[in-house]
Amino acid sequence: MNKKLIFFTPLFVLLGVCILLIAGLNQDPKKIASALIDKPVPEFYQANLHEPSQIVSPKEFPKQPFLLNVWGSWCGYCKEEHPLLIEIAKTLPIVGVDYRDNRQNGIKMLKRMGNPFILTIDDSHGELGLKLGVDGAPETYLVDENGVIRYRHSGLLDKETWQTVFLPKIEALKNK
């Protein structure tokens, strides 16, 4: 009896761990909600990408709904979504966070592809990304006029997601 218990206990523990791992792998990271939903953007003081002597904080954010877009010049999906951000910026302010990037590379990318951002934060060391809970770029946050995060999208922002997810949420914010 004791030998069976000694043999089967680790087997059941291993089986339980395997089930938990498989369940975790089946989760879509884009659907994992941020712990910051309905909370203010975390406090930070970081350099402006284009003017490193200028320190940026949430006090500089627009006083209307806006997007907070985490990107990097090294990120293929960031480059892919960039033309859509240029279009969105015509109707909605976007604040950019150049995440874990070389400052000069970020500036070169914006010169080459266009700059959709009203403000670009240099997060070359990832401090703001850590506070936001960023798990990779790109990530796009919808922030309300009070600086409160209302939605987080992890991964490529495409036209369909913009139209079916973001636009209704923005309309709801404007109508409240």
UniProtKB/Swiss-Prot annotation:
One GO location term (cellular component): outer membrane-bounded periplasmic space
Claim: Transmembrane helix is one of the keywords in the record: yes
Periplasmic domain ranges by topology: 26-176
Residue ranges the record marks as coiled coil: none
SUPFAM superfamilies, sorted: Thioredoxin-like (SSF52833)
Primary site of residence: membrane
Record's subcellular location: Cell inner membrane
Gene3D superfamilies recorded: Glutaredoxin (3.40.30.10)
Segments traversing the membrane: 5-25
Keywords, in A-Z order: Cell inner membrane, Cell membrane, Cytochrome c-type biogenesis, Disulfide bond, Membrane, Redox-active center, Transmembrane, Transmembrane helix
BP GO annotations: cytochrome complex assembly
Membrane topology category: Single-pass membrane protein
Membrane topology, Cytoplasmic segments: 1-4
Limits of the Thioredoxin domain: 35-175
Annotated disulfide bonds: C75-C78
PANTHER family, A to Z: THIOL:DISULFIDE INTERCHANGE PROTEIN DSBE
Family from the record: Belongs to the thioredoxin family. DsbE subfamily.
Biological role: Could be involved in disulfide bond formation. Could catalyzes a late, reductive step in the assembly of periplasmic NrfA c-type cytochrome, probably the reduction of disulfide bonds of the apocytochrome c to allow covalent linkage with the heme. Possible subunit of a heme lyase.
Name the UniProt record assigns to this protein: Probable thiol:disulfide interchange protein DsbE-2
